[in-house]
From Swiss-Prot:
Lineage: Eukaryota, Metazoa, Chordata, Craniata, Vertebrata
ZnF bounds (C2H2-type): 485-507, 513-535, 541-563, 569-591, 597-620
Keywords: Metal-binding, Repeat, Zinc, Zinc-finger
SMART domains: ZnF_C2H2 (SM00355)
Organism: Homo sapiens (Human)
Compositionally biased residues, Low complexity: 87-134
Gene Ontology BP annotations: regulation of transcription by RNA polymerase II
GO MF term (any one): DNA-binding transcription factor activity, RNA polymerase II-specific
Region described as Disordered: spans on this chain: 29-144, 638-659
Listed name of the protein: Zinc finger protein 853
PANTHER family hit by this protein: PR DOMAIN ZINC FINGER PROTEIN (PTHR16515), ZINC FINGER PROTEIN 22 (PTHR16515:SF58)
Compositionally biased residues, Basic and acidic residues: 135-144
Length: 659
């Protein structure tokens, strides 16, 4: 058995017991770092210590020089097989072992081992010392040869547990390192995962923020769109309200205009009624006066019938010229004086009546104006509810074709009774009023005709008169058509020279025909005749529906439209229709804004005649009576009369102008 002491340093001490069953041999080996022999002793048998001490120097001197050749083959092979692995282990252990662990091993090896020596000494006997010495000699050589190998083996055996421990430690350290590395890797992985999670969370937060921003932007856009839509709806509502307000205002204006027109018409009707009443009164008075005059004239005519010659009848082909023939009478001066007195009385009575009528008219007009103002205030206070009805704009308006048929004025002849044989007409007798068919002009209307019992009226209608033309007159008319006369001012052509002369009076302003009652002048005699009917109260044109009478045929035509409902005059702007052209002209001023009536005192302009009259009466203290031809003293007498007279003369002219 080998006893292995704990190694302390590179110098190793080994003890080896070799012997047979009968003998024991103790061999101490010591290996130093420098290769010198150690103080170990070989004990075998009962030899003394001195022999051992003597042999030791020899062994020491001889042992290093001898090679280890005589070693057994088995031990050398084992040593050689174990050397490479042991060397590698030693090198690894030496590299891995720290220096503080090597120093105590070296110290343990250098310590003496007295315990082993004390155990070997009791076993030595005297008989065995020689054999032991021989064996020792033999074995010393072998021991010297095996000494380094044994040392190596001993070292290897000593180092194996340490190596195992160190390997275990290393393994543990490696495992710890691996565990640490694994933990670190896990920590790193966790950190990376955390970082990834943090990054993902940040990305998610960013995406959420972006989504929130997009949602906010979308909400803002939606809000803006809603606000814009609300604004558009509000604008549309405002526009609709404005349109409704404008339509309401327009309708209110139209209603006001219609009301004003109705009020004006009412005023005009009331004024016309008043005028008619006044005219009726005047006519009654005039009839009474005429009856008195007729009685006087009949008496005078009865006295003079015997003195007058029979009247001469004109030929058909010759034109009749009526002239006044002077008559000499003895009582002419007396008759003239009586006439003058009667005329003065009549004028005074007329003036008084006219003043009274003017006062009455002014009072009635003031009352009517007050009533109108009250009605307007009431209408303004009342709420006007308007109902809008859809109108088809694409509907075609019906075309109204008007066929104007000229109304032929009838010629009325008042035959003046004349004396039987004297040939002189009675002064003061009513003059004959002649109204010719269209195209004919009465040059002179005064003619001495035979006396009759009562004044007769001879009516010559237009178509019958024109159809009953003589061949000579028809020839003259044809020649006039072939040679028409043309006006040098406006270029208008006429078939007769008399028509041209009458037309030229409109350019020159001549008014040769004057009224004997009021002194008003006219350019045409027919206009004077129609004007004189105002004074005489004559109304030859009767309505076939209501038996109402009129002094002019145009007035009869206009009146008959109230029964038939005909409204031939249509407004081109709004389509409203009227039965009278003057109403259409007055209505069109609301569209055009025309103000034709100018105040001569202040220059203010007005749209309607009623407005300027009210203005003059309220501000300037002036007034005029309608239909009587009375004007202010500062204005000329023929300011408004000619236009009306000319309109009355040409019945179809206003209709043509309106169309």
């Amino acid at each position: 058995m080998l006893h292995q002491p704990t190694p302390g340093n590179r110098g190793l001490t080994a003890r080896m017991e070799v012997g047979p069953a009968t003998e024991t041999f103790v061999l101490e080996l010591q290996c130093l770092e420098d290769g010198g022999p150690g103080p170990d002793t070989l004990s075998g048998g009962s030899g003394g210590s001195e022999s051992q001490e003597e042999e030791e120097p020899q062994e020491r001197n001889s042992s290093p020089q001898r090679p280890a050749v005589s070693a057994p083959v088995g031990a050398s092979e084992i040593a050689e097989e174990t050397r490479p692995g042991q060397r590698e282990l030693q090198l690894q252990q030496l590299e891995q072992q720290p220096e503080p662990q090597q120093q105590p091993q070296h110290e343990q090896l250098q310590q003496p081992q007295p315990h082993l020596e004390l155990q070997q000494q009791p076993q030595q006997d005297g008989q065995q010392q020689l054999s032991q010495l021989q064996q020792e000699k033999h074995q010393s050589v072998h021991h010297q040869e095996l000494k380094p190998e044994l040392q190596l083996m001993h070292q290897q055996q000593q180092l194996q547990p340490q190596q195992v421990q160190e390997q275990q430690r290393l393994q543990q350290q490696q495992e710890q390192l691996q565990t640490q590395q694994a933990q670190e890797q896990q920590v790193l992985q966790q950190q990376e995962q955390l970082q990834q999670q943090v990054q993902e969370q940040q990305l998610l937060q960013q995406q959420q923020e972006q989504l929130q921003q997009q949602q906010l932007l979308q909400q803002q856009e939606q809000l803006q769109q809603q606000q814009f839509q609300q604004q558009q709806e509000q604008l549309q509502q405002q526009q609709q309200l404005l349109l409704l307000q404008q339509q309401g205002q327009l309708q209110q204006q139209l209603l006001q205009q219609q009301q004003a027109q109705l009020q004006q018409q009412l005023l005009e009707q009331q004024q016309a009624q008043l005028q008619q009443q006044l005219l009726l009164q005047q006519q009654e008075q005039l009839q009474q006066q005429q009856q008195q005059q007729l009685l006087q004239q009949q008496q005078e005519q009865l006295q003079q019938q015997q003195l007058q010659p029979p009247p001469l009848e004109p030929e058909e082909e010759e034109e009749v010229e009526l002239e006044l023939m002077p008559v000499d009478l003895g009582s002419e001066q007396e008759l003239e004086q009586q006439r003058q007195e009667l005329e003065r009385q009549q004028e005074l009575e007329r003036q008084q009546e006219q003043r009274q009528l003017q006062l009455k008219l002014q009072e009635e007009l003031q009352q009517l104006e007050q009533q109108l103002e009250q009605q307007q205030q009431q209408l303004e206070q009342q709420e006007v509810q308007l109902e809008l009805t859809p109108v088809e704009l694409g509907a075609q308006q019906q075309e109204v074709q008007l066929e104007l048929t000229p109304v032929q004025p009838e010629l009325q002849l008042e035959l003046v009774p004349a004396a039987g044989g004297g040939g002189a007409a009675v002064p003061g007798a009513p003059a004959a009023v002649v109204v010719a068919p269209p195209g004919y002009v009465v040059v002179q209307e005064l003619m001495v005709l035979p006396a009759v019992a009562a004044p007769a009226v001879v009516a010559i209608p237009g178509p019958a008169g024109s159809a009953a033309l003589t061949p000579a007159r028809q020839r003259r008319r044809r020649r006039a058509r072939d040679r028409p006369t043309i006006c040098g001012e406006c270029g208008k052509g006429f078939s007769r020279s008399t028509d041209l002369v009458r037309h030229q009076a409109t350019h020159t302003g001549e008014r040769p025909h004057r009224c004997g009652e009021c002194g008003k002048g006219f350019s045409q005699h027919s206009n004077l005749v129609t004007h004189q009917r105002i004074h005489t109260g004559e109304k030859p044109y009767a309505c076939s529906y209501c038996a109402k009478r009129f002094s002019e045929s145009s007035a009869l035509v206009q009146h008959q439209r109230t029964h038939t409902g005909e409204r031939p005059y249509a407004c081109g702007d709004c389509g409203k229709r009227f039965s009278v052209s003057s109403n259409l002209l007055r209505h069109r001023r609301t569209h055009s804004g025309e103000r034709p009536y100018v105040c001569e005192d202040c220059g203010e302009r007005f749209r309607h005649k009623v407005q300027i009259r009210r203005h003059e009466r309220q501000l300037h203290g002036a007034g005029r009576s309608r239909g009587l031809g009375l004007l202010r003293a500062s204005r000329p007498a023929a300011l408004g009369g000619p236009a009306r007279a000319e309109q009355a003369a040409t019945a179809t002219a206003p209709a043509d102008k309106a169309l």
